[in-house]
Swiss-Prot record:
It holds the Pfam family MTPAP-like_central. One of its GO terms (cellular component) is mitochondrion. This is Caffeine-induced protein 16. PANTHER family: CAFFEINE-INDUCED PROTEIN 16, POLY A POLYMERASE CID PAP -RELATED. It comes from Schizosaccharomyces pombe (strain 972 / ATCC 24843) (Fission yeast). InterPro entries: MTPAP-like_central, NT_sf. The lineage of its organism: Eukaryota, Fungi, Dikarya, Ascomycota, Taphrinomycotina. GO terms for molecular function: RNA uridylyltransferase activity. Gene3D superfamilies: 1.10.1410.10, Beta Polymerase, domain 2. Residues 1105-1159 form the PAP-associated domain. It comes from the Eukaryota. GO terms for biological process: mitochondrial RNA catabolic process; nuclear-transcribed mRNA poly(A) tail shortening; polyuridylation-dependent mRNA catabolic process; RNA 3'-end processing; siRNA catabolic process.
Length: 1202
């Protein structure tokens, strides 16, 4: 730490000098600047700083390093700044990069050399007369390496209010513990009183927990039970696992409990089979101070009993645990110091924390509650989160205004709009206005241009719909706005760093000073909801008063809104309590601008004649604001309670299907289009109207086209009804006519039922539980693994191009499955497909009209309706019980048994033994599903052989001959990009052996580390892999994405969902490197963060179950909604934290999935135009099936469900 802090000032001075020069400077000029004596105090660099630069390798090595490439560009002995817009290099950003640079240098030197360097630096610093000139002004003037100095002077007051230890039972004990800080100035190998106190403090918590456990039990307890209890119940309280670490450090519970220091507390009995412990006096209360003193004696005796090396290890370990607890588990001393007026000065963090503590005790509305939830992040210097929360609402207001205005609007117009909306009456007005002024409104509007956001077609939305889209978190536009501003803030976060404290203090000041009634009355989210809900009913009332009657009673108004003949359609509106809200507002004469209420009668205001939708929206919004400003607390509370009962998720699905007698007003705004339904007059969006027309056309044309097929199937069904059912048979040979007719009976009955449903509602042939099943004999063979279930689908798809002969079919099957199935099995499958009418009975076998209809792409039918597939992928439908239940036992059902895993290990061992015949050392490594832990019962074994001395590919033929002597079904594939040898081992385990290709090992490790972050990730990866394998779309040599590619798609999806489950493990790959040699791409950086422990708690924000995540995966990639992935515009890259547009080299590729390590490699480049269509069909099919509430996993994997 001292080394890095000494480098700060030279680097910052060099940065300021280069910025002042405004041009490139030579390395010679830079060396003169740093090492020449300077009279100017601002540029004066002390001897310790110069020594640090020299020991760090010199300026050339420092400035050309990867760690400082964000600030300096070094080329041909010239130095220039990367970003000239920066005024300086902030210490919080620069210091970690210097630490990383020094760690890289340290790895290149021996421990003795590095200790000598540190000793020289420390000695030189101590000789310095004024230590303050060694460091920048915002870095503590201390030579200590304590972890607390990672936080700088701006937060010193906050650190002083932190308490290292928590409350205890005795004042004396508090005094003792307050002196337990680690003094880093002392020798690390010295046993000091502070370190003994720290070890005793760490031991105190687990010992107290052990006492509690023993008091509950009436007899002595086995130590094994105690360890298990501590691990399961996590009884380590405030210090996490630090106490248990110290227990292990001192030899475990046995050594500790055997000590004489704790003899007055515990009685320990050791037998041959058990090690039991009990309390000496279970009823007596043990004083915490006495226990702490005993533990101090114990720790002191342990230290003194150790040798030099063991003592040094124990002291270092306890010191690290103490530092970790100091930085992570300390509590703030919350005071009640009032916050001061913050204009240009930063308010102390102590005061902000006090206000934060106060406001958390109140009740607030949803939008403000989101900001309260983020306050803790603001205090951790999350300026990007603060700016996103403050800038989101201005962007929402600007977008709504632009769409309702229907014209180009000037920047001045939006500036004036923001001044009016976010005035002093707004609860966060001061904070938002200060943020806009600090950053610059023009800069925000230029960077966050409305054109950056996908345009919403105004013709396809009703008047109030834009409010729902912008302000309801369930709608797509809200998330788009949030992502847009989040992306811009993250890119420019360094520019706002100085203004962070001021903005933070203003926000806390606004929230803490606002009263409850003020917040309820002026909260924007509630007002937008009320406006959006009330506009359409108010239009209905105004039209009725203009065209039919001049007045209406309040009861008549409510009847008009609900509709007399449309009770079923509008029952959901009644559930939303809209009538209660409207009647309440009318009774209090809120809308007197255009509606007058007097003695139970509602009339039009004669002075109001502008009833355009935009003007009506403005008036409703203004009326609500005026009412809420001037109303009493009781009235506000009543409105708030009504507003809270409005279910916005239900409202957003209604799409304003209200019965409106006069639609002239709505035709003026071109917001909706009128269409007549057979049951009632409803208004639906134009996009829905187009889907309805396509649906009707499909129903008429397709049913007429296949009418003859339906008649033939009905006759077959009538004949089958007279025949007998299946007779049970133990052999696997289909009997003659009875089995044939009954098989056709069962399948045809289901198929006709599907046609009937198709005829009535015009949807796909998959309707709930109506599905085609194989005959009982085929089903039985599938269950016994005589042949795979997807063999039926494989043969069915091959009939698209036609199967010329039976021998050709055998060749197809062997090429794909690498196994020769008996002729009888293949003939049974052909006969079954022939009997249900899917393929022809003569060679060449081709699809019939029925089979072609079954494989037809659903988008050509227009059947993907919003009624079947919700726009919200994560809609928590309670009917997904059957799917969730089928997924619970999924992993156990497909996981390989111990026999298969043992056989795989035996194959590796046998292969390694056989390859010893080659010259030189040969190593074998596994990759793929065996390494990632995603194996199933049918998974292959992927192996690679390599040598550290030479390439093994020249020994290809010799290795092939060795394998032929040991294994069966050997198939060499020499012409592939990566030559492999396929063979089969024990228990029919298929193996692939490659040469010198080490990159897949790191690919597999990356998948493994992602799966360790959350238990749902592994399950979802196995589900998608298993689904792709069953649907025959997981083999690259058949022009489909590989299993590895599907895993990458799953990981990218879990990174992009609204509440991400997975982080980016390659985020810091530009600072670290792990080079692996690849034959085609040269040196490849395969570094990623393998420490996944830190992500397990922070990333698990949303607890969506597997069923919803699986459905969301297929909807994300398979549909073409606003929420879905745009294959034409973007590409998948899990090493990037944000969506990336297709580069020019991939613009002609339909799918682009980048390799995490090879940035120029598209994992889906082998896909053809036909295979892309098949993949999209399969994704859409899965989404359709999972959209049915009664679906389960069998439906998803069944080859005969469309």
């Amino acid at each position: 730490m001292l080394f890095a802090k000494l480098l700060l000032k030279p680097v910052q001075i060099l940065f300021a000098y280069a910025k002042a020069k405004s041009k490139e400077i030579s390395i010679k000029e830079a060396n003169l600047l740093i090492f020449q004596d300077e009279t100017d105090n601002l540029r004066k660099i002390s001897t310790p700083n110069k020594l640090a630069v020299s020991l760090a390798g010199g300026l050339k090595a420092l400035l050309s390093s990867n760690q400082l490439c964000h600030a300096f560009h070094y080329h041909n002995k010239k130095i220039r700044l990367v970003d000239t817009s920066l005024n300086n290099l902030p210490v919080p950003i620069l210091l970690p990069k210097l630490i990383n640079y020094l760690l890289a240098r340290k790895s290149q030197k021996s421990a003795a050399e590095w200790e000598e360097i540190e000793r020289a630096l420390l000695s030189c610093c101590k000789r310095s007369k004024d230590p303050s000139i060694l460091f920048p002004t915002d870095v503590p003037c201390s030579l200590d390496d304590d972890v607390s100095f990672l936080t700088f002077k701006g937060h010193k007051n906050h650190l002083e209010n932190r308490s290292f230890f928590h409350d205890s039972e005795s004042d004396n004990f508090k005094v003792v513990l307050s002196n337990c800080a680690i003094n880093s100035k002392e020798d690390n190998n010295l046993v000091t009183e502070d370190r003994v106190n720290l070890g005793a403090k760490l031991l105190l918590v687990p010992v107290q927990n052990l006492i509690k456990l023993l008091k509950v039990s009436k007899i002595s307890v086995d130590l094994a039970v105690i360890d298990h209890s501590f691990q399961d119940q996590k009884l380590t309280l405030e210090v996490g696992n630090g106490g248990l670490e110290v227990v292990k450090l001192f030899g475990g519970w046995i050594r500790i409990l055997e000590s004489e220091c704790l003899g007055h507390v515990f009685s320990f009995k050791k037998t041959m089979k058990r090690k039991e412990v009990a309390l000496v006096n279970r009823k007596a209360d043990i004083d915490t101070t006495d226990l702490f003193i005993a533990l101090r004696q114990l720790v002191d005796s342990k230290f003194k009993s150790y040798g030099i090396k063991a003592q040094k290890h124990a002291i270092n370990r306890i010191s690290k645990l103490g530092k970790m607890i100091t930085s992570n588990h300390a509590e703030e001393k919350l005071t009640t110091i009032p916050i001061t007026e913050a204009k240009k000065e930063s308010v102390s963090n102590t005061a902000l924390i006090a206000r934060k503590n106060i406001i958390r005790e109140r009740k607030y509305l949803s939008r403000m509650f989101d900001i309260f939830e983020h306050i803790d992040s603001y205090f951790n210097h999350e300026i990007n989160m603060l700016l996103v929360d403050l800038l989101l609402e201005p962007l929402q207001v600007a977008f709504v205004y632009k769409n309702l205005a229907r014209r180009w609007i000037s920047l001045e117009e939006i500036e004036n709009l923001w001044l009016k909306v976010f005035d002093s009456s707004h609860p966060l007005g001061k904070s938002i206005t200060s943020t806009l002024q600090a950053i610059g409104t023009r800069k925000i509007l230029t960077q966050l241009s409305i054109n950056m956001i996908p345009r919403y077609n105004q013709d396809n939305c009703s008047a109030g719909d834009i409010y729902i889209l912008c302000f309801s978190e369930n709608c797509w536009l809200y998330s788009v706005l949030q992502k847009t501003i989040d992306h811009w803030v993250n890119e420019n976060v360094e520019l706002f760093y100085k203004k962070f404290e001021i903005l933070k203090s203003l926000l806390i000041e606004d929230i803490a000073n606002s009263t409850f009634s003020k917040e309820v009355s002026l909260n924007s989210s509630l007002r937008w909801y009320c406006v959006a809900i009330l506009v359409t009913p108010l239009q209905l009332i105004i039209n009725h008063l203009k065209d039919k009657t001049e007045m209406l009673s309040l009861d008549a108004v409510m009847t008009l809104i609900l509709g007399k003949n449309t009770r079923e359609v509008n029952s959901s509106i009644e559930e939303l309590k809209i009538t209660d809200c409207l009647s309440f507002l009318l009774e209090h004469n809120i809308f007197n601008t255009f509606l007058v209420y007097n003695e139970g009668i509602v009339k039009l205001n004669k002075d109001f004649d502008d009833f355009t939708p935009l003007n009506l929206l403005k008036c409703v919004n203004y009326s609500l604001m005026e009412f809420q400003k001037n109303s009493t607390f009781d009235m506000l509370e009543k409105l708030y309670e009504i507003g809270r009962e409005i279910d916005m998720s239900k409202f957003s699905t209604l799409k304003y299907n209200l019965q409106l007698p006069n639609v002239d007003l709505l035709k003026e705004s071109e917001a909706v289009s009128e269409t007549k339904n057979t049951k009632n007059n409803t208004f639906i969006l134009k996009s829905d109207l187009k889907e309805e027309e396509r649906l009707t056309n499909f129903t008429i044309e397709e049913i007429n086209k296949h009418k003859a097929i339906g008649v033939a199937l009905r006759k077959l069904l009538e004949e089958a009804d007279t025949s007998s059912n299946f007779s049970s048979s133990n052999n696997h040979v289909l009997d003659s006519s009875k089995h044939t007719v009954s098989s056709a009976s069962t399948s045809s009955r289901k198929f006709i039922e599907n046609y009937k449903s198709l005829e009535s509602i015009g949807l796909t042939s998959f309707v709930k539980d109506n599905k085609l099943k194989a005959s009982k004999e085929l089903q039985k063979l599938i269950e016994e693994n005589v042949f795979p279930k997807n063999l039926i689908l494989f043969i069915f798809r091959k009939c698209v191009i036609g199967i010329k002969s039976f021998e050709k079919l055998q060749s197809y099957v062997f090429t794909y499955y690498c196994e020769r199935y008996p002729k009888l099995i293949l003939k049974r499958v052909l006969r079954f497909l022939e009997e249900i009418g899917f393929i022809t009975s003569q060679y060449p076998r081709k699809l019939t009209d029925t089979g072609a209809l079954f494989l037809k792409h659903p988008s050509e039918w227009g059947v993907l309706q919003h009624t079947f597939i919700s726009s919200n992928f994560f809609e928590n439908v309670p009917c997904y019980i059957s799917l969730e239940q089928s997924l619970q036992n999924f992993q156990n059902d497909i996981r390989p048994d111990t026999v298969r895993t043992t056989a795989m290990k035996a194959i590796i061992k046998k292969l390694l033994k056989s390859l010893r015949k080659l010259e030189g050392p040969v190593k074998i490594a596994c990759f793929g599903s065996y390494r990632t832990g995603l194996m199933t019962k049918n998974s292959d074994l992927d192996l690679v052989i390599y040598s550290s001395k030479e390439a093994l590919l020249p020994y290809y033929d010799r290795v092939k001959s060795i394998i032929k002597n040991e294994f069966s079904n050997v198939m060499p594939i020499r012409g592939a990009r990566i030559p492999i040898i396929k063979f089969t081992g024990q228990y029919n385990i298929h193996c692939d052996l490659s040469f010198d290709n080490l990159l897949p090992i790191h690919n597999s490790d990356l998948i493994l580390n992602y799966s360790l972050i959350d238990e749902r990730v592994k399950t979802l990866l196995m589900l998608v892999k298993y689904w792709a394998s069953n649907r025959l779309i997981d083999k690259t040599h058949h022009a489909f994405p590989s299993s590895y590619t599907w895993c990458i798609m799953v990981i990218f999806y879990l990174q992009q969902i609204p509440e991400p489950i997975l982080p980016n493990l390659q985020k810091l790959s530009t600072q670290y490197s792990k080079i692996v040699r690849d034959n085609d791409y040269g040196n490849v950086n395969c570094w990623f963060n393998r420490d996944t422990e830190c992500y397990r708690g922070s990333m698990q924000k949303g607890r969506k179950n597997i069923a919803l995540l699986l459905r969301g995966f297929f909807c994300y990639y398979g549909l073409t909604t606003q929420y879905s992935f745009d294959w034409e515009a973007y590409m998948i890259d899990i090493s990037s934290s944000q969506l990336k547009r297709k580069s020019t080299e991939f613009k002609d590729c339909p799918f682009v999935v980048l390799d995490p390590f090879l940035k120029k490699k598209n994992l889906t480049k082998a896909l053809t135009q036909k295979s892309v269509k098949v993949v999209r069909y399969e994704l859409e099919r899965a989404c359709r099936i999972l959209s049915d509430p009664k679906c389960n996993l069998d439906h998803l994997l069944d080859p005969l469900i469309q």
